[in-house]
Amino acid sequence: MIGLTYKYTPMKPSVLKNMENILGKEKINAYMDQIEDSLYIEDNNGRQIISGNYSNFKKEEFISGIPLGIKGKINNKGIFIFNDFIFYKNIFLNENENNYNNNNIFNTPSLNNTKKNNQEEKYILFISNIKIGFPQNEKGLNESIRTLLIEFIQNRNNINTVFKNFSNKIKKIILVGNSLNTEEKEYENKIINDNSRPSSQEIDKQILDNYIVLNNFLNFISNYIIIDLMPSSDTNDNLLYPQNPLNKLLFSENVKNINYHVLNLVSNPYFFKIKSQNEFKYFIGTSGENIKIIKQYSCYNNNIDIMKKNLEWRHLCPISPNYLNLYSFDNQTDPLLIQELPDVYFTSSNEIEFKYEKIIIDNKQIILMSLPDFSKTAKCVLYDYENDSYKIIEFNFKV
């Protein structure tokens, strides 16, 4: 059988369940139930419940929307029991437990974080969740950290960091999601003790003020280096996925004038290539929405594990559009399909730790990076795309 997986999840949010939450039922952050969930495969003829006949089978590892081919037979209970299955691009897993473990397509090479060919260092600076425009009680600290970041990018002599000599080797800056803090709850938190809530006009004014600060920040750094600005669900520009680039009308004349040369308003997910040595390296990046939604409907809690599954499924978010709002597209190409394996796959996260792993798929080395939350850690990542190495930059500021 060949079709798409469908996972029935009774804990999936619904209008009536949302009413229960309003009436006092505790809200949940994940909707997976190992006992109640059911796994199906569906095609044009209908939907068939399935189960795996091998010891390592776990239905919680599957989500809806995965292209799948299975081999097996239907038992007397009407369940299709499969012992072999295939994902996109001829990735097989065998019913035998030993073969199942040995046939894992993800091989972690014994490579460390060192230069491979002593090439000239060329860096991309990844900044995730910079969240310009914190609530007032955190504004001073946020501005101070941002000032240190600007000084680092401008390679000012007065910045006290061992990494200042790397600034002139940065070829591109990528702001990966949540560049603007537009979360209403952030503004609510500062006055929650007053049992009051800011009006929509106050929130809109705060968002507008934050856009002005973002404009000033971009104006400072775009005079020095190329910037790619990725949108996210928190920028309130386009809540449908994949997200189009931010509207130019959101930016001042100074920034828009620079935009034609060094400020690139890009999409989310973001696919691009950059020249490395005598070849081009292919990058795929997301602002993390696909990772977050897959976490809610699967057993995976680690961003890197989900990123591996994205590559295995050859899709950034198979679960869309059922659980992640997806805009309709009239051509035959799925915009979230991974048609070519990347050299680097990166994503934004709300996590404190930076996670980095090198894997090999189909004899190709792929680097996975789950970026640290800059607003929580004041950390960003310098990735040397010539030598496949990285450095973590941390800005410390004491009031």
List PLM regions with ranges:
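Extended recognition/assembly regions associated with phosphoester-bond processing machinery
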Residues: 1-399
